[in-house]
């Protein structure tokens, strides 16, 4: 399989000779049947330079080209803004999101979100793809977040997220001293019926697993610098799990954290690790701390 611009070309080999095109694409690209059918309906697949609209038998020596560039209408309004790009190619984008900005709009016409800035970035670079986030970050959480540029990349990265091979590492400043230096919090999370946005540990909630390691502590100020890795991705997962241990994040007023040091939860997604959806290369993107977290670390954990 070779990359050609924003597409892929497969030269049918002896092993693939006589196979159905769907089978070849599913095996070679990990593409689902709906994705392949969508490519065909939009004339994005060509065999020997001829558009293919239906499944067919391929022969050794056939050249199958898949155009991954998609021309799709999007409800996200492009809006200019600076982006801190950690990684980008024709298939995926990783951004260091600042705190205070939502990942995506919650309603048509909304602006001021990260997705709006990415839509503008795509527009000025001649890319006609939708803004597809692979995972989310809370509005007041900073750090690395992954976007896919086409359906295939999104499907593969989403599968990695489901299989827990897309790794997300966070750094948090929690209140108090944790009892153990490292461990795993395995507590289901559900909605808090007494509050419209808050979550809580609940026996009837969804499975939620967080691994943690204390990197440093400050006994005088009763603060802990904690590195965390998500095995699942529930809303507010780290915030809920640490609060359930009696160690809310500093600045996280929703879950009982004090706000004298920071006016937002002290949580930063410092690293994401994923297998590239097309090349199978291991992509590791590290997001530098924003100024507020950097200053706290320098002051209390230097």
From Swiss-Prot:
Enzyme class per UniProt: isomerase
Residues in S4 RNA-binding domain copies: 19-90
Superkingdom, taxonomy of origin: Bacteria
Reaction catalyzed: a uridine in RNA = a pseudouridine in RNA
Enzyme Commission no: 5.4.99.-
GO molecular function, one term: pseudouridine synthase activity
Alphabetical list of InterPro entries matching this protein: PsdUridine_synth_cat_dom_sf, PsdUridine_synth_RluA-like_CS, PsdUridine_synth_RluC/D, PsdUridine_synth_RsuA/RluA, RluA_PseudoU_synthase, S4_RNA-bd
Disordered as annotated region, ranges: 182-205
Keyword RNA-binding: yes
Pfam annotation, one family: PseudoU_synth_2
One GO term (biological process): enzyme-directed rRNA pseudouridine synthesis
Keywords per UniProt: Isomerase, RNA-binding
Catalytic residues (positions): 138
PANTHER family associated with the record: MITOCHONDRIAL RNA PSEUDOURIDINE SYNTHASE, PSEUDOURIDINE SYNTHASE
Name of the protein in question: Uncharacterized RNA pseudouridine synthase YhcT
Source organism phylogeny: Bacteria, Bacillati, Bacillota, Bacilli, Bacillales
